[in-house]
């Protein structure tokens, strides 16, 4: 695929074994962790946890990243679209209050394909760094958008995120 999913619009080739884009990730999802997560904002975690899927890679590369192993070092396991759909169902079956996609920007295509296979009955959370394509948000795929507010100026963002 020629990738233009994030605002960088890098036109990179992203295939199963090719990852030329800014995010450095292949087209197939790479997941660092998927499980119930009790440490999000209380309204997201609830009493049973948020069904969190941590994707590897990132479109920001902030110098202060708390998840740099996940965001820049490709830590995680490559999974199929079918497996992503299964993970959503498994998390829902475990009692998750929602399905929480963390750093999903560069894998929105995979999430949409997985949702065609299985659509959870619980809310879908788009948990991101805040550098997003407005057209994606207008598509109304996700129920909750959890954005990080990192910077108030372009100058600061250029200094601390690549």
PLM segments and residue spans:
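Generic secondary-structure transition motif, activating predominantly at the C-termini of alpha-helices
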Residues: 7-10, 27, 92, 161
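Auxiliary Fe-S-binding modules of radical SAM enzymes
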Residues: 1-20, 25
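Anionic-ligand binding region
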Residues: 156-162
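Conserved Radical SAM active-site core
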Residues: 19, 23-145, 153-155
């Amino acid at each position: 695929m020629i990738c233009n999913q994030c605002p960088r619009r890098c036109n990179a080739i992203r295939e199963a074994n090719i990852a030329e884009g800014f995010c450095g990730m292949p087209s197939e999802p790479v997941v660092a962790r998927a499980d119930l997560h009790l440490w999000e904002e209380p309204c997201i975690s609830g009493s049973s946890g948020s069904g969190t899927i941590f994707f590897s890679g990132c479109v920001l590369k902030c110098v202060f990243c708390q998840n740099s192993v996940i965001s820049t070092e490709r830590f995680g396991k490559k999974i199929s679209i079918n497996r992503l759909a299964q993970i959503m169902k498994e998390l829902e079956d475990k009692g998750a209050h929602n399905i929480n996609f963390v750093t999903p920007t560069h894998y929105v295509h995979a999430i949409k394909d997985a949702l065609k296979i299985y659509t959870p009955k619980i809310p879908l959370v788009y948990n991101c760094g805040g550098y997003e394509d407005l057209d994606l948000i207008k598509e109304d795929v996700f129920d909750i958008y959890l954005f990080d507010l990192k910077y108030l100026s372009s100058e600061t963002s250029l200094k601390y995120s690549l």
